[in-house]
A protein has these predicted regions:
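Thioredoxin-like thiol-disulfide oxidoreductase module
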Residues: 17-81, 89-99, 149-190
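Short active-site neighborhood of thiol/selenol oxidoreductases, capturing the structured segment around
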Residues: 1-9, 13-14, 39
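Non-globular targeting/processing and membrane-anchoring segments
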Residues: 93-223
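Nucleo/cytoplasmic regulatory scaffolds in medium-to-very-large eukaryotic proteins
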Residues: 3-4, 25, 122-123
Length: 223
């Protein structure tokens, strides 16, 4: 896995924290990862962290942006698939199982296997329909004043709990389809790192060589 921040620290990117809470403890996922994969994680760069000071001595520290990707390599260390972002446990298990098959298949058949995956996407039964997420009270209060809500919303989203795993799953399945398309077209990368850089730049819209990761947007209300 490649991620912003460190997997062994509390404040890694939000997705990786949910991997540890929702995915890795799942008995089926845990068994598959333990028995069929050689596990490795690597930080691509530090994750941005924001501190909110309440003015009375209390502070909250949260990560502000970031994403992660699970790479599946064949026995020779060549990528055969990549699972971008967070998925529900059922979908993650299905994608991992399929990617494990890619890793053991004849390399010459890899484009065709990805074409088949594009033609046969996971059925809707693989993940349950999402329930509309309930906005936290701080978000609802901010929306009463729409102008200041535009300024506050990025930080409010950061400190609000993630509640739409199924929504993330749908979004990331669409990103994963683009990875299928790349492999199906015979795309080649000079290295695993080169593939990771393309994923962060093209899929996550987060070039790793951007010093601010897109966070240096001018404040429209600054004097």
């Amino acid at each position: 896995m490649r991620l912003l921040g460190r997997l062994d620290q509390e404040l890694s990117c939000a997705n990786s924290r949910f991997f540890k809470q929702l995915l890795y403890p799942n008995p089926q996922i845990n068994e598959l990862l333990r028995d069929q994969f050689v596990l490795h994680w690597q930080s691509v760069r530090p994750v941005p962290i924001v501190t909110i000071d309440f003015g009375d001595g209390r502070r909250i520290r949260k990560t502000l942006t970031g994403n992660s990707v699970h790479l599946v390599l064949d026995p020779d260390g060549r990528p055969v698939d990549a699972l971008p972002g967070l998925f529900s446990p059922g979908v993650f298990l299905a994608l991992l199982t399929r990617a494990h098959g890619y890793a053991l298949a004849d390399r010459s058949k890899l484009p065709e296997l990805h074409r088949q995956a594009l033609a046969q996407p996971l059925p809707p039964s693989a993940y349950r329909p999402p329930a509309p997420p309930s906005e936290p009270r701080a978000v609802r209060a901010s929306m009463i004043a729409p102008t200041k809500h535009m300024v506050e919303m990025p930080v409010l989203r950061v400190v609000s709990p993630l509640s739409d795993i199924e929504g993330d799953t749908r979004t990331n399945l669409a990103l994963h389809a683009r990875i299928h398309q790349a492999f199906a077209s015979g795309a080649q990368w000079s290295s695993v790192d080169a593939m990771v850089e393309r994923i962060y730049e093209d899929l996550f819209q987060m070039p790793l060589d951007d010093p601010a990761l897109g966070l240096d947007v001018p404040d429209p209300f600054a004097a």
